[in-house]
C-alpha cells in the first residue's frame, strides 16, 4: 500500500465519468502494465471508494423525478397530423393497406426515436443531477429505452404474431396509460418477462450441448507442426477494433516481412505492441494459427490456441480449453434476447439512406434510365435501372451526385429542389452484398362494407388456380366495392326479379337485410305470378308447401312464390307451345307403382288474353289416374238409376275436347275393364261371352291381363275385345240381385240366397248379360271407389295476402271429372287415364267504374340455380284514377315484356301521402353473379349511399328554386351526342322516384310543379346506363342487387357546363373522391357514374381499394362481397435482418446446422455446392481431398463469422477462438462416399477428417469422402467415447449399439472419467508426463514429408485462385471477421 501512496503525486487527475466500458478498458490496461497481483490491489481501492461515495450520496428515486420531455406535445401532434393525411389518402385509394401500415409505423417509430434522443439533452440542461438521469447511464441493468418508456412515450408494441400494431402508445408510464393502450401493451410487456425465464433455460441447455461436444479437448502438446494459417486483414468492412481483437493473443503462422526486414517471426504470439506495428506498417495479409487447423486428432496444441484468456501468457499444457470454450459461448446466452423489440425495420427495406440536395438548384438527369414506380410508402418515384448521375445546378455551381442502381429517385427532371431536400433513397442492402434475408408475409385486406366488387383493370388468373377465383393483378389498380344493400335470400333459392327491376324495400337497421314492403305504389299495374313447384308430401298427397309464402310487392308486380323449394323437387319446366307443365315429384313409395309424374299444367291461349272465369291451370292428381280402361259412375250413395241399360257397352268415339263434368259429389266409382282393339282381319282366339283365365291368348300376340268374361264386338274396321273381371251368378228365384242390371250396390247388402250368404265388403256393380234371348246370367264386377278430397288446397299454393287490395285476381279451385256419367273410357294401351282434374279458375272482382273483361297473360322466364323456370304473369290492365280527377296519358314503360302494348299507366301522385313513403324505400335490383348455389342474393341499391351535387350558377338560394329550375330546363336536349353510340337501357329507377328522391320537403312537389311539366319530363328524359366495356349492362341474373335511389349520388352540373373545360364523363366510369369534374363544381364522392344527364350526374357510391401488382384478388368481378370478406391478399417482403430468429435461437440454429426456410445462407447446401464445384475443376482424386479440405475451411470461417455476428449485434464480446474450437468439432467429420472406396471404411461411415487423411497416406490410395456439417447434438453423439454419448442422450440406444459393435472406450475425455469416477486427465500438473512423451515424437522424417505435402497443397490453392474466383461464391473469403 505504501508504494501506491508514494506514487500518487505523479498521477494525473482524470475528471471523467467512468462507466462499465471505461472500467473494462482500465482494468485490462492495468493488467497489461502491472500484472495481476498489483491490479487486484488497485481494484480493491476502487471498490471501497465507490461504496463510500454511494453511501454518502444515497440516491433515491421518486415519482417527481420523472420529468416528461416538453417537446413531446407537438411531436405527437405532428405525427397524428401525418397519420390523418395518410388515412385520407388511403380512403381516396391512393395507398393500400400495407403501405399505410408501413408508413404509419415509420412515422411513429421516428417520433418515438426523436423523443428518445431529446431525453438525454433535456435532462442535462434542466436537471443534471436527476436520479433517473444518473441511473440511466450507470451501467446497471436497464438502459435508455426503459427510461424512455418512463418519461418519453412507450411507442409501438408488437402483437403475438410479431407484427407491429400500428396504434402507438402515446403516453408514457409517468402519465399513465389509457385502457386501450394498456391492453395493447400487455402482450409485449408480458413477453419480456416470460422471455427472460425461458431464455435462462434455453441458454442452459445450449451450454450443456456445447460442453458435451468439446469436453475432451485439452491442450496436450506445444506444437503440432502445422504450417497452415488463415489470413486476417482489415478489409471487408471490418472495423479496426474488431481486427485488433482478432489478432491479440494469437500466434503467427508465417514470418512477416516488411521489405527485406522480418518484423515478426513464425510461432510468435501477438501482443498489443506487435499489433500497433502492423497497423503502422500496413503489412497484409497476416496469417495466424487457429484451433481448427491444428494437426492433433483429439486435442489441441498450445500454439494453435494462443494466449490463455486468464493471464497474458501462452496457454498451459493440460488446460481444459474445450470446456472453457463451451461455457464462454453458452453463458452470454442469457443476455441474448429471444426476439428484440426493435421496431424500425419491421417492413422491407429496413431503413433507407437518403441522398439530400447540397444546395438550392435545378435537378437534371437522364429520363431514359429511370421508370416510374411506387416507393414502399406508396409515393410516386422513379426507379433507376443503372447507376444514375444526377446534376444539380445553381447559378454557376454544378454538383454531381451518383445514385446507385435500384434506388428510388423522389424528384422529377428539371425540378427545383431546396437545400437538404431528399432527392433519392438508396435501398438498404444494395450498396454492399450483405445477405439481408427477406421473408414473404401475406396480409389479407377485408372489406369493410358490403356491395358488388369491381376491378378497374384486367386481372388474370393465377395459372395454378385456373378454375378457382384467385386472380393476380398485373399492374397497380383499384378494386371498387360498389355500395348497395344485400338481400341474402335464404328463404327463396331463386328470385323472381329480373335485372333492373324495382322493388320496395324496408331496411332493417340491425340486420341489414331487406324484407319486402307490401305497400301499394304509384303504378297501378297488377301482375300476378303463379309458380307451382314443390316436392310432394309423404304418401303422395297433394303438394305440401312448408313455410309461409311471401309476396313481394315491388311497386310494379306482385309475385307469389312458394317459400321453400326442397332439394329433390324437379323444377325443369317443359314448355310446349302455349302450355307448360311444372312437374312435381311424388313420394318415393308411390314411385314403385311406376306412374308417370304428374304436374300442374298452365294453358294460355295463343293471343295471351284470358276471359273472366276461364281455366288458368289444371292439376292432374296421380291418385285419380288409372292405367286400364273402364267406366266412371257417380251420383249419390245407392243405386244410380239414370243409366241406360245395355248401350253402356256401345262404343263411342272419343271427342278431341271431352266435356268436363263439374263434380258436386263426394265420391265416384270406376269400373275397370280390359279393352283390346284388334284390326278387323285378325283372328280372335276366344268366343264371345266365354270365360277365360288370366294370361290367356286372345289374339296372335295379345294375352289377357285379367281373367273373366269376354265380350267380342265387331265394328266395321276393327274388333273390340272387352274382358270383364268379376263373379258370375246364375239367377235363382230368390236372388234379388239378378233383377237389376247396371246398378251399383253398396257394401253390406248381402244375398238372400242362404247357400251363399255372402256379404260384399266393397261396392259392386251388377250387370246382366244375355247371351241368348232366354238365358241370362249376372256378372258382379268389382268397383274402385274414389273419395274426392280437396285435391289441392289452394290456400297453401297461393295464399291470399291480407295486405292485397280488393281488385286482385282471385283463383278458385274446381275439381272436374273428365268423363261423363256412365261413359266408357277407353284407354289406349300403356297410357294412363286421368279421371279427375283439379282446375284453377281465374276470376277478378267487379270494379265500381266498370269491369275489365280480359287480362293479359304471359310467361316470364326466371333463371335460378342454372335451371330456367317459367312463370306466368297476369296483367290486370287498369286505368289509374288521379285524385285530381284527370286522366293521365299512358306512357310506355319498358317493363312488361311480352305484350308490347302500352299497358302501364304511370301516375306518380296516386295519393298525396304515397310519395313520401315511396321516396324512402324504392330501389332498383342489380343482379349479381354469385358462386353460392344454395343461397342466391341480391343487392339493393338504396338511397343512403347516394349523394347528388348541385351547383346552379353558384346560387345558394333555397331548395325550391333549384328544383323548379331543374325541371323548367328544356328537357328535349339530346344526350346522345355526349354519350357516344351506346344503346339505352331500361331506366334505373322510375323517373318520379329517382328525381324527387332528394327533395327534403315533399310539399314542394305539390306546390311548385305543374303536372304538365312532369309529363313532358317523363317522356323525354331517358337514362343511359352501361358498363365499362360499353356493353349494355346485364350480368348473369343469378342473384340480385336492389338499388335504392339513395345509393346514387346526384351531381348537378352547372348550366354553362361544356365538355372542353373539364373531364369527359362516361357512364360506367369510376371516379375517385376529390376529382374535380367541372370548373367550379364541387368535389364529388368516389363512385361509378351511372347516369349522365344534361344537367346532372348520378354516381353510385363506391369505395376504392388500391392493390399493387402481384396482389391476389379474391372473388369475381361483379360478385357480392359481404362485410368482412377477404378482398385482396398482399404479399410483401419483410426483412429478416435477424429480427425474427435472432439471439439465442439464431446461434442455436447455426450450431445445430439446421436449415430454416428462406434463409439463403443455408450452410449444408453451400457445403455440398463447394464439394461439387471443386471436384469439377480439379478432377477426381485430388478433387475429393482438396475439396473436403477447402469446403471445411470455408464453412468453418463462415460459421465463425455468423455466430460472432449474432453476439456482436447484442453487444456481447466473445473471443473468436472459443467459437473456433466448437466449430472445429462440428466440422471435423467427413462422410465416406461410394466411388473409389477403400476396403477400410464402409460407404456412408462418418470418420474424422484427420483420420481419413492419414489412412489415405498409409494405404497410398485416395479415399473419396466429402465434408459434412454435423449439428452439436449429432456431434456429441458421434464421439470416440460411448460413455460420454450415453450420458448425454438416448442412453439405452447408444449403449445397445455400442455393445453390438463391441466398441472400446479409451477413456480419453473428461466426462468418461467423471462417470467412472477415475482421475480426470486434465490440469496443469501433468506437465512432466506430457513432456516425456514428446521425446519420442521428434523423428523429423515424418514431419518433413507432411510439410512438403502441405506446401504442395498450398501451391495448388494459389495457382487455382483465379479459377475459384470464377466459380466459388463470395470470392472464397478466407478471412476472419
UniProtKB/Swiss-Prot annotation:
Biological processes annotated in GO: DNA-templated transcription
Protein's UniProt keywords contain Zinc: yes
Sites where the protein binds Zn(2+): 224, 294, 301, 304
Signal peptide range: none
One GO cellular component term: chloroplast
UniProt KW Chloroplast keyword: yes
Disulfide-bond pairs as recorded: none
Needed co-factor(s): Zn(2+)
Reactions listed under catalytic activity: RNA(n) + a ribonucleoside 5'-triphosphate = RNA(n+1) + diphosphate
Organism superkingdom: Eukaryota
InterPro entries found in the cross-reference section: DNA-dir_RpoC2_beta_pp (IPR012756), RNA_pol_beta''_euk (IPR050254), RNA_pol_Rpb1_3_sf (IPR042102), RNA_pol_Rpb1_4 (IPR007083), RNA_pol_Rpb1_5 (IPR007081), Rpb1_funnel_sf (IPR038120)
GO molecular function, one term: zinc ion binding
Chief location bin: plastid
Localization in the cell: Plastid, Chloroplast
Entry's cofactor comment: Binds 1 Zn(2+) ion per subunit.
Keyword field: Chloroplast, DNA-directed RNA polymerase, Metal-binding, Nucleotidyltransferase, Plastid, Transcription, Transferase, Zinc
EC number(s) from the headed UniProt entry: 2.7.7.6
Gene3D superfamilies for the chain: 1.10.132.30, 1.10.150.390, 1.10.1790.20, RNA polymerase Rpb1, domain 3 (1.10.274.100)
Function: DNA-dependent RNA polymerase catalyzes the transcription of DNA into RNA using the four ribonucleoside triphosphates as substrates.
Entry's family note: Belongs to the RNA polymerase beta' chain family. RpoC2 subfamily.
Complex formation: In plastids the minimal PEP RNA polymerase catalytic core is composed of four subunits: alpha, beta, beta', and beta''. When a (nuclear-encoded) sigma factor is associated with the core the holoenzyme is formed, which can initiate transcription.
This protein's name: DNA-directed RNA polymerase subunit beta''
Gene (name only): rpoC2
Amino acid at each position: 500500500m505504501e508504494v501506491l501512496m508514494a506514487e500518487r503525486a505523479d498521477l494525473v487527475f482524470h475528471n471523467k465519468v467512468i462507466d462499465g466500458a471505461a472500467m473494462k478498458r482500465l482494468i485490462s490496461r492495468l493488467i497489461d502494465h502491472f500484472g495481476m497481483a498489483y491490479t487486484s490491489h488497485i481494484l480493491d481501492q476502487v471498490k471501497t471508494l465507490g461504496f463510500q461515495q454511494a453511501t454518502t450520496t444515497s440516491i433515491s428515486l421518486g415519482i417527481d423525478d420523472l420529468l416528461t420531455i416538453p417537446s413531446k406535445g407537438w411531436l405527437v401532434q405532428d405525427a397524428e397530423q401525418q397519420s390523418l393525411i395518410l388515412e385520407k389518402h388511403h380512403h381516396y385509394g391512393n395507398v393500400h393497406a400495407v403501405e399505410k401500415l408501413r408508413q404509419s409505423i415509420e412515422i411513429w417509430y421516428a417520433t418515438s426515436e426523436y423523443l428518445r434522443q431529446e431525453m438525454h439533452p433535456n435532462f442535462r440542461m434542466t436537471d443534471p443531477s436527476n436520479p433517473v438521469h444518473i441511473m440511466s447511464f450507470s451501467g446497471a441493468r436497464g438502459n435508455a429505452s426503459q427510461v424512455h418508456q418512463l418519461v418519453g412515450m412507450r411507442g409501438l408494441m408488437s402483437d403475438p404474431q410479431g407484427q407491429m400494431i400500428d396504434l402507438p402508445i402515446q403516453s408514457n408510464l409517468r402519465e399513465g396509460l389509457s385502457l386501450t393502450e394498456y391492453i395493447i401493451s400487455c402482450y409485449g410487456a408480458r413477453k419480456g418477462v416470460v422471455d427472460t425465464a425461458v431464455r435462462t433455460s434455453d441458454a442452459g441447455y445450449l451450454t450443456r450441448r456445447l460442453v458435451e461436444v468439446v469436453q475432451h479437448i485439452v491442450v496436450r502438446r506445444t506444437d503440432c507442426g502445422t504450417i497452415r494459417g488463415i489470413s486476417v486483414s482489415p478489409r471487408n468492412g471490418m472495423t479496426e477494433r474488431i481486427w485488433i481483437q482478432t489478432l491479440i493473443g494469437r500466434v503467427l503462422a508465417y514470418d512477416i516481412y516488411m521489405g527485406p526486414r522480418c518484423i515478426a517471426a513464425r510461432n510468435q504470439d501477438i501482443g498489443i505492441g506487435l499489433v500497433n506495428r502492423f497497423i503502422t506498417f500496413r503489412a497484409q495479409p497476416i496469417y495466424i494459427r487457429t484451433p481448427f487447423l491444428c494437426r492433433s486428432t483429439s486435442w489441441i496444441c498450445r500454439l494453435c490456441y494462443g494466449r490463455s484468456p486468464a493471464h497474458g501468457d501462452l496457454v498451459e499444457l493440460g488446460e481444459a480449453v474445450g470446456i472453457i470454450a463451451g461455457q464462454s459461448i453458452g453463458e452470454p446466452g442469457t443476455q441474448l434476447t429471444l426476439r428484440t423489440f426493435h421496431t424500425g425495420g419491421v417492413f422491407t427495406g429496413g431503413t433507407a439512406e437518403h441522398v439530400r440536395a447540397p444546395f438550392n438548384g435545378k435537378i437534371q438527369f437522364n429520363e431514359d434510365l429511370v421508370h416510374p414506380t411506387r416507393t414502399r410508402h406508396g409515393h410516386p418515384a422513379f426507379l433507376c435501372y443503372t447507376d444514375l448521375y444526377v446534376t444539380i445546378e445553381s447559378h454557376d455551381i454544378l454538383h454531381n451526385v451518383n445514385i446507385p442502381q435500384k434506388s428510388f429517385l423522389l424528384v422529377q427532371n428539371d425540378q427545383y429542389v431546396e437545400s437538404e431536400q431528399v432527392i433519392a433513397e438508396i435501398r438498404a442492402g444494395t450498396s454492399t452484398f450483405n445477405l439481408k434475408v427477406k421473408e414473404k408475409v401475406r396480409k389479407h385486406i377485408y372489406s369493410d362494407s358490403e356491395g358488388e366488387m369491381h376491378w378497374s383493370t384486367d386481372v388474370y388468373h393465377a395459372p395454378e388456380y385456373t378454375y378457382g377465383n384467385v386472380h393476380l393483378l398485373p399492374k397497380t389498380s383499384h378494386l371498387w366495392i360498389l355500395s348497395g344493400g344485400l338481400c341474402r335470400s335464404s328463404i327463396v333459392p331463386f328470385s323472381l326479379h329480373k335485372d333492373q327491376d324495382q322493388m320496395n324495400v324496408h331496411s332493417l337497421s340491425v340486420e341489414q337485410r331487406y324484407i319486402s314492403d307490401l305497400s301499394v305504389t304509384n303504378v297501378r299495374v297488377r301482375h300476378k305470378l303463379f309458380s307451382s313447384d314443390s316436392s310432394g308430401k309423404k304418401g303422395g298427397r297433394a303438394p305440401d308447401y312448408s313455410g309461409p309464402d311471401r309476396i313481394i310487392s315491388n311497386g310494379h308486380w306482385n309475385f307469389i312464390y312458394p317459400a321453400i323449394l326442397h332439394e329433390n323437387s324437379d323444377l325443369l319446366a317443359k314448355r310446349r307451345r302455349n302450355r307448360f307443365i311444372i312437374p312435381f315429384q311424388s313420394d318415393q313409395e308411390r314411385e314403385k307403382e311406376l306412374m308417370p309424374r304428374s304436374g300442374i299444367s298452365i294453358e294460355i291461349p295463343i293471343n295471351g288474353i284470358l276471359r273472366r272465369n276461364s281455366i288458368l291451370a289444371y292439376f292432374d292428381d296421380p291418385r285419380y289416374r288409372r292405367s286400364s280402361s273402364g267406366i266412371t259412375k257417380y251420383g249419390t250413395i245407392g243405386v244410380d238409376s239414370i243409366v241406360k241399360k245395355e248401350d253402356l257397352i256401345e262404343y263411342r268415339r272419343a271427342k278431341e275436347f271431352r266435356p268436363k263434368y263439374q263434380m258436386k259429389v263426394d265420391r265416384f266409382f270406376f269400373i275397370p275393364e280390359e279393352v283390346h282393339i284388334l284390326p278387323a282381319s285378325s283372328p280372335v282366339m276366344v268366343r264371345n261371352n266365354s270365360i277365360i283365365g288370366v294370361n290367356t291368348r286372345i289374339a296372335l300376340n295379345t294375352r289377357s291381363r285379367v281373367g273373366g268374361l269376354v265380350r267380342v264386338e265387331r265394328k266395321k274396321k276393327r274388333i273390340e275385345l272387352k274382358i270383364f273381371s268379376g263373379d258370375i251368378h246364375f239367377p235363382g228365384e230368390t236372388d234379388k240381385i239378378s233383377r237389376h242390371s247396371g246398378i251399383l250396390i253398396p257394401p253390406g247388402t248381402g244375398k238372400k240366397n242362404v247357400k251363399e250368404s255372402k256379404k260384399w265388403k266393397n261396392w259392386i256393380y251388377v250387370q246382366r248379360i244375355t247371351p241368348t234371348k232366354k238365358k241370362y246370367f249376372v256378372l258382379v264386377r268389382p268397383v274402385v271407389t274414389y273419395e274426392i278430397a280437396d285435391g289441392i288446397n289452394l290456400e297453401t299454393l297461393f295464399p291470399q295476402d291480407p295486405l292485397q287490395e280488393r281488385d286482385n285476381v282471385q283463383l278458385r279451385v274446381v275439381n272436374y271429372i273428365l268423363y261423363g256419367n256412365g261413359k266408357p273410357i277407353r284407354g289406349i294401351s300403356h297410357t294412363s287415364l286421368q279421371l279427375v282434374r283439379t282446375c284453377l279458375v281465374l276470376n277478378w272482382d267487379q270494379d265500381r267504374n266498370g269491369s275489365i273483361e280480359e287480362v293479359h297473360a304471359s310467361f316470364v322466364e326466371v333463371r335460378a340455380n342454372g335451371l330456367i323456370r317459367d312463370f306466368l304473369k297476369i296483367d290486370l290492365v287498369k286505368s289509374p284514377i288521379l285524385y285530381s280527377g284527370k286522366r293521365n296519358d299512358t306512357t310506355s314503360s319498358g317493363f312488361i315484356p311480352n305484350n308490347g302494348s302500352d299497358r302501364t299507366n304511370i301516375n306518380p301522385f296516386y295519393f298525396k301521402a304515397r310519395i313520401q313513403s315511396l321516396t324512402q324505400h324504392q330501389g332498383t335490383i342489380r343482379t349479381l353473379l354469385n358462386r353460392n348455389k344454395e343461397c342466391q342474393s341480391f343487392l339493393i341499391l338504396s338511397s343512403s349511399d347516394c349523394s347528388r351535387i348541385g351547383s346552379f350558377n353558384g346560387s345558394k338560394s333555397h331548395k325550391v328554386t333549384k328544383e323548379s329550375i331543374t325541371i323548367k330546363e328544356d328537357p328535349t336536349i339530346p344526350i346522345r351526342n355526349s354519350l357516344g353510340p351506346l344503346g339505352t337501357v331500361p331506366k334505373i329507377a322510375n323517373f318520379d322516384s329517382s328525381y324527387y328522391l332528394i327533395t327534403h320537403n315533399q310539399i314542394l312537389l305539390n306546390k311548385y310543379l305543374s303536372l304538365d311539366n312532369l309529363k313532358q319530363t317523363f317522356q323525354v328524359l331517358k337514362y343511359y346506363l352501361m358498363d365499362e366495356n360499353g356493353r349494355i349492362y346485364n350480368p348473369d341474373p343469378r342473384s340480385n342487387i336492389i338499388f335504392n335511389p339513395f345509393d346514387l349520388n346526384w351531381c348537378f352540373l352547372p348550366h354553362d357546363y361544356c365538355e372542353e373545360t373539364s373531364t369527359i364523363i362516361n357512364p360506367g366510369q369510376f371516379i375517385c373522391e376529390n376529382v374535380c369534374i367541372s370548373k367550379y363544381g364541387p368535389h364529388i364522392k368516389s363512385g361509378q357514374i351511372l347516369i349522365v344527364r344534361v344537367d346532372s350526374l348520378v354516381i353510385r357510391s363506391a369505395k376504392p381499394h388500391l392493390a399493387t401488382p402481384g396482389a391476389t384478388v379474391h372473388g369475381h368481378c361483379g360478385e357480392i362481397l359481404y362485410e368482412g370478406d377477404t378482398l385482396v391478399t398482399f404479399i410483401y417482403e419483410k426483412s429478416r435482418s435477424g429480427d425474427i430468429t435472432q439471439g439465442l435461437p439464431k446461434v442455436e440454429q447455426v450450431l445445430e446446422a439446421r436449415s430454416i426456410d428462406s434463409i439463403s445462407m443455408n450452410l449444408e447446401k453451400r457445403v455440398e455446392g463447394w464439394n461439387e464445384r471443386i471436384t469439377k475443376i480439379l478432377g477426381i482424386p485430388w478433387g475429393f481431398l482438396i475439396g473436403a479440405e477447402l469446403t471445411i475451411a470455408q464453412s468453418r470461417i463462415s460459421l465463425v463469422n455468423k455466430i460472432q455476428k449474432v453476439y456482436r449485434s447484442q453487444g456481447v464480446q466473445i473471443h473468436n477462438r472459443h467459437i473456433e474450437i466448437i466449430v472445429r468439432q462440428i466440422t471435423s467429420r467427413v462422410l465416406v462416399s461410394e466411388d473409389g472406396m477403400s476396403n477400410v471404411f464402409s460407404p456412408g461411415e462418418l470418420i474424422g477428417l484427420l483420420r481419413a487423411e492419414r489412412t489415405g497416406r498409409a494405404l497410398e490410395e485416395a479415399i473419396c469422402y466429402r465434408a459434412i456439417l454435423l449439428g452439436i447434438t449429432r456431434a456429441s453423439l458421434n464421439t470416440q467415447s460411448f460413455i460420454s454419448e450415453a450420458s448425454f442422450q438416448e442412453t439405452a440406444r447408444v449403449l445397445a449399439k455400442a455393445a453390438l459393435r463391441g466398441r472400446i472406450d479409451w477413456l480419453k475425455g473428461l466426462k468418461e472419467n467423471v462417470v467412472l469416477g477415475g482421475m480426470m486427465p486434465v490440469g496443469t500438473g501433468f506437465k512432466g508426463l506430457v513432456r516425456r512423451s514428446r521425446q519420442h515424437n521428434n523423428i523429423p522424417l515424418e514431419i518433413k514429408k507432411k510439410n512438403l505435402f502441405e506446401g504442395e497443397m498450398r501451391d495448388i490453392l494459389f495457382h487455382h485462385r483465379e479459377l475459384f474466383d470464377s466459380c466459388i461464391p463470395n470470392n472464397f473469403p478466407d478471412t476472419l471477421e
